[in-house]
Amino acid sequence: MSRITFDTLLEAGAHFGHLKRKWNPAMAPYIFMERNGIHIIDLHKTAAMTETAAEALKQIAKSGKKILFVSTKKQLKEIVAEKALSVGMPYVIERWPGGMLTNFPTIRKAVKKMATIDKLTQDGTYSNLSKREVLQISRQRAKLDKNLGSIADLTRLPSAIFVVDVMKEHIAVHEANRLGIPVFAIVDTNSNPNDIDFVIPANDDATKSVEVILDACCAAIAEGIEERKVEKVDTEAAEGEENEAKKAPRRRTTKARAAKAEEAPIAE
């Protein structure tokens, strides 16, 4: 698993927290010092906690489950989407749909509506509609795709969510907490870490800071997915050998043949 180092985090500016007056006292255990009115995060703890989170994410991925990435910050949308896509995980980078987790069946209906609209374009139904109706449906499809397209493959609730900036994504965190879904998060000095299962204390505003942490976590997820594939191949191979062994005719032992000969009637 790719390890994240103190130097990597330092170069990325992951140690810069917020102004002292904006801090959340619950983040005190993760703060190293104050400099020029700004809190400095303890990167030794950041590195260690990133490793812990990465290992947990690896195990989730290895079990074949999904992790939902969440970040609606403008400067972080692209990087979060890129990293989530690299490991085949769903993500939300537009406005968080209220009830995304707590009212998941309704969200799934909206996703299925996209598939229904796509079917209309394929079976020729569009040709029977007016231009105005086609335009309305096309706009509806575009809106659904923008907000929900990135979770189209999420057929059931995720097994965990990974959040960047727990203050901005507080609704997502709250919904996950209500359902008992583990929350992994990059938490800055102005945020409350108490509702987070796997805290990664770091600068959640700087693109580079978020990127290096996501790199480490996604590398672990990729390893988990690969290990699952290898185990599946090994299991299938073992099952195949077992089935072949069952099909093969059993050779009778010498004792069994002798016993059968003794039972045979002697010709007079």
Identify the role of each PLM range.
Residues 1-232:
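Ribosome large-subunit tunnel/peptidyl-transferase-proximal elements
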Residues 1-3, 223-268:
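Intrinsically disordered, compositionally biased charged tails
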